[in-house]
């Protein structure tokens, strides 16, 4: 029974063993691949394939292998190298590396590298050894050495282990620099020793070069050392000035100022102080200074000496020599600057003084000095009235004002149509052949007429040529020279004797110049009073002046008429119209204004047109009215009719027409030609030059003068053509064509520039022809 039970137990054990025992069956490679693929498809398994695809590994195992690589490489592993070693794609390595760094605080991912704390501790020990050896180290040097980011080195390596592994301190001024205490002490000792040996100002750069200390360390340790001196600045060219030297400077400046109450900038700069003004302000913070260009004056010197003396000068009505109260080494420029500054600061009233050559005159003193000049002004005014000088000045001034006003009005009225008119002239001139039908647009010359006041510019064209007055003058508007009744020399004679007594005769001319205008105006005002007090005398003199003026204009018209009669009838008609519109209009204005004065009529505008003159004539007395109206109508008729109408007006005004003196005609024509030649020599404008040359040649050939505007140049050239040889005609024709080309082209065009160059080249020939032409030379050449 017992044996059976034992058998049963044995069988039960064998059965249990059979149940627990599994059969091992080896699968083929293909079956394994299919099983893994099936697991991957059902996402029951995650693996990472190698780069060649022959192997795969789970992420957890790959992570352990990455950590193993980090350990094998001493705590610093480059992910690129790990990827090559493990034969796994870099992106998989980077993902796992980020997970490792995130899960493990002791591991850092820096620029594609895994770094653990063991490696950080290792490089901290290296940094400490280097710091002990050199005494100073910077983050930039460490970044270059370890090939790590500077921020990582500073925050996670150096600052983290500073005071533990790394024995040193951080620079407060530059946190990226670290020192050892021993290095700081050595630098302090060097700086302290060098500064203690210095007795004069020296550049900081020289000190640093000698002791071998960096500039930034020098400036950071300087305050801790508390040297016996100071550094001027922290810039490159700063200097160290020892206190002993600064004390010597200050003692000298204080002593000089105490004795003289002023300081010279040059003297301070010689002490080695570059900015003298700033040094003075710093050295004397409680003192007030008057800073000039070369010196600084103390307030005590200015207030107690100069201002007090000026006030006394004003009170006593005398003068003050500033050189006697100011330091002797001040120049005249310095003294003048002192006076100007005091006046600007209103220490005294500027209107009470006059400064001349270091001398300050009070106004009462000068007023008393020039008092005799009042009598001089009175006598000069009376002499000007008695001699008729002032009356002549009034006439010239009135005529000039009328002429200028006329020119301005005509210029304003003609602005609208000038451009179109110029285009028409240019196109019409271009259409003609040779000199036939050519019209040259030129600038105006002056009307050549005798008399002291030049007539106003005519209104025929903005560019018409007006022949210059035989009395002189240029192309511009006439300006009457101011009348000088009292001259500087007259005042000098009166005040020199008084100034010689004071030794100030060298200032007589400057003082006289100050009062010349004042006394001249006084004399003119007095002359005006005397002039207005004798209306009959003034009227007679004005009557005589206008009578001479009208006779001069009539003689001019007669001479111009002879010249224009040499032209064909159609051109002659245009020249007559132009002559009456210019000179005839002047005669009408002169007589209308004179009659208005005789009738006590007020005329606001002295430059009258035909309608204004007719209206003025209607307001005049009956004895003048008809004659003036007829004269205005005659402006549109012939020259003879105009002269007859003018004679009627002159008779009504009790004026005499001078007899014709034909003996003087040749002299007048010769004088007229000389004035044209003078204008020609001074002329640079090609169009005006051609116009003047044509007028001169016409006078030389015909023996007559001509009053013509620029549009008649073509007609003049055609008229004189027969008296010139072929070469001369060709020269004038070519010059005329070039002038038209310049006027028609735009100013900056190549065509205009080329034409101007040709004109410049031909200018001398044209001038030579006009200046030296004579009929005899032409006949000889022919």
UniProtKB/Swiss-Prot annotation:
Transmembrane segments: none annotated. GO terms for cellular component: endoplasmic reticulum membrane. GO terms for biological process: protein K69-linked ufmylation; regulation of proteasomal ubiquitin-dependent protein catabolic process; response to endoplasmic reticulum stress. It holds the Pfam family UFL1_C. Keywords: Transferase, Ubl conjugation pathway. GO terms for molecular function: UFM1 ligase activity. Residues 404-477 are annotated as: Disordered. It comes from the Eukaryota. Residues 443-453 have a biased composition (Basic residues). It is an enzyme of class 2 (transferase). InterPro entries: Ufl1, Ufl1-like_C, Ufl1_dom, Ufl1_N. Its EC number is 2.3.2.-. Belongs to the UFL1 family. E3 UFM1-protein ligase that mediates ufmylation of target proteins. This is E3 UFM1-protein ligase 1 homolog. It comes from Drosophila erecta (Fruit fly).
């Amino acid at each position: 029974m017992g044996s059976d039970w034992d058998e049963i137990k044995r069988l039960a054990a064998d059965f249990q063993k059979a149940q627990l025992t599994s059969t091992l069956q080896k699968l083929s490679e293909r079956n394994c691949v299919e099983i893994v693929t099936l697991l991957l498809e059902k996402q029951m398994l995650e693996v990472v394939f190698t780069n060649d695809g022959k192997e795969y590994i789970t992420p957890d195992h790959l992570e352990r292998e990455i950590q193993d690589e980090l350990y094998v490489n001493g705590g610093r592993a480059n992910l690129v190298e790990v990827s090559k070693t493990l034969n796994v794609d870099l992106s998989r390595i980077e993902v796992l590396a980020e997970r490792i760094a995130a899960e493990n605080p002791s591991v850092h991912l820096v620029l594609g590298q895994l770094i653990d704390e063991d490696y950080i501790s290792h490089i901290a020990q290296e940094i400490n050894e280097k710091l002990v050896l050199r005494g100073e180290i910077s983050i930039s040097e460490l970044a270059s050495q370890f090939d790590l980011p500077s921020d990582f080195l500073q925050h996670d390596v150096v600052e983290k282990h500073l005071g533990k592994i790394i024995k040193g301190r951080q620079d407060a001024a530059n946190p990226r620099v670290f020192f050892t205490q021993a290095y700081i002490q050595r630098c302090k000792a060097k700086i302290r020793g060098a500064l203690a040996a210095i007795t004069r100002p020296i550049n900081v750069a020289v000190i640093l070069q000698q002791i071998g200390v960096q500039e930034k360390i020098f400036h950071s340790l300087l305050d801790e050392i508390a040297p016996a001196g100071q550094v001027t600045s922290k810039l490159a060219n700063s200097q160290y000035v020892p206190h002993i030297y600064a004390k010597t400077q200050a003692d000298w400046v204080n002593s000089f100022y105490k004795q003289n109450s002023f300081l010279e900038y040059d003297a301070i700069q010689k002490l080695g102080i570059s900015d003298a003004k700033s040094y003075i302000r710093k050295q004397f913070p409680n003192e007030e200074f008057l800073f000039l260009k070369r010196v600084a004056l103390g307030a005590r010197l200015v207030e107690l000496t100069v201002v007090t003396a000026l006030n006394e000068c004003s009170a006593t009505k005398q003068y003050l020599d500033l050189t006697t109260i100011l330091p002797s080494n001040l120049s005249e420029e310095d003294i003048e600057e002192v006076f100007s500054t005091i006046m600007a600061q209103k220490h005294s009233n500027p209107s009470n003084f006059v400064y001349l050559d270091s001398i300050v005159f009070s106004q009462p003193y000068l007023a008393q000095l020039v008092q005799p000049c009042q009598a001089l002004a009175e006598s000069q005014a009376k002499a000007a009235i008695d001699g008729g000088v002032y009356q002549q000045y009034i006439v010239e001034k009135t005529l000039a004002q009328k002429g200028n006003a006329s020119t301005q009005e005509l210029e304003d009225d003609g602005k609208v149509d000038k451009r179109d008119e110029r285009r028409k002239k240019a196109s019409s001139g271009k259409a003609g052949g040779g000199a036939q039908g050519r019209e040259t647009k030129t600038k105006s010359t002056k009307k050549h007429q005798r008399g002291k006041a030049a007539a106003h510019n005519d209104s025929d064209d903005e560019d018409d040529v007006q022949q210059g007055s035989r009395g002189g003058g240029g192309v511009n508007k006439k300006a009457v020279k101011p009348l000088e009744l009292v001259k500087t020399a007259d005042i000098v004679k009166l005040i020199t004797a008084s100034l010689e007594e004071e030794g100030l005769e060298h200032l007589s001319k400057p003082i006289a110049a100050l009062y010349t205008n004042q006394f001249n105006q006084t004399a003119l005002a007095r002359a005006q009073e005397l002039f207005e007090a004798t209306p009959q005398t003034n009227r007679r003199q004005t009557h005589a002046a206008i009578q001479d003026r009208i006779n001069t204009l009539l003689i001019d018209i007669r001479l111009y008429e002879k010249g224009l009669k040499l032209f064909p009838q159609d051109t002659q008609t245009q020249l007559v119209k132009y002559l009456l519109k210019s000179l005839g209009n002047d005669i009408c204005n002169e007589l209308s204004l004179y009659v208005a004065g005789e009738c006590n009529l007020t005329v606001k505008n002295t430059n009258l047109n035909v309608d204004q003159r007719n209206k003025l004539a209607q307001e005049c007395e009956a004895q003048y009215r008809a004659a003036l109206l007829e004269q205005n109508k005659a402006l549109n008729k012939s020259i003879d009719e105009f002269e007859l109408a003018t004679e009627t007006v002159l008779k009504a005004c009790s004026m005499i027409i001078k007899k014709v003196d034909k003996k003087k005609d040749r002299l007048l024509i010769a004088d007229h030609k000389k004035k044209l030649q003078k204008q020609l020599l001074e002329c640079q404008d090609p169009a005006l030059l051609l116009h003047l040359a044509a007028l001169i040649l016409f006078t030389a050939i015909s023996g007559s003068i001509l009053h013509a505007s620029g549009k008649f140049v073509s007609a003049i050239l055609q008229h004189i053509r027969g008296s010139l040889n072929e070469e001369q005609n060709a020269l004038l024709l070519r010059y005329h064509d070039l002038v038209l080309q310049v006027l028609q082209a735009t100013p900056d065009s190549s065509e205009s520039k080329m034409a101007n160059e040709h004109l410049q080249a031909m200018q001398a020939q044209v001038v030579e022809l006009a200046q030296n032409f004579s009929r005899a030379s032409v006949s000889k050449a022919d």
